[in-house]
């Protein structure tokens, strides 16, 4: 049986407490990173979509405003065909 005096016991207790704090901080950082992964994936998915819509709507004369009906009108009247050219049917 190992007998510790008060200062050794206090030192060990303090070291365990510091280790526990480090583990908790690492766990918190890991938790934050894990929670951010879906946001990063969502951002990575929507960035090309937003870029496409921005360039698509910039070419549309009808959808100059941010109105939903203008966007739908733009999508209806300016549909790209398979060759990549713009079909403008007004």
From Swiss-Prot:
Keywords: Membrane, Transmembrane, Transmembrane helix. The chain crosses the membrane at residues 32-52. One of its GO terms (cellular component) is membrane. This is Uncharacterized protein C330.19c. It is found in: Membrane. It is a single-pass membrane protein.
């Amino acid at each position: 049986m190992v007998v510790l005096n008060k200062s050794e016991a206090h030192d060990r207790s303090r070291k365990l407490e510091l280790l526990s704090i480090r583990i908790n901080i690492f766990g918190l950082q890991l938790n934050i990173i894990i929670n951010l992964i879906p946001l990063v994936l969502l951002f990575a998915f929507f960035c090309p979509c937003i870029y496409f819509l921005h360039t698509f709507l910039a070419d549309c004369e009808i959808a100059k405003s941010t109105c939903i009906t203008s966007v739908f009108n733009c999508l209806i009247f300016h549909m790209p065909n398979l060759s990549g050219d713009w079909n403008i049917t007004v």
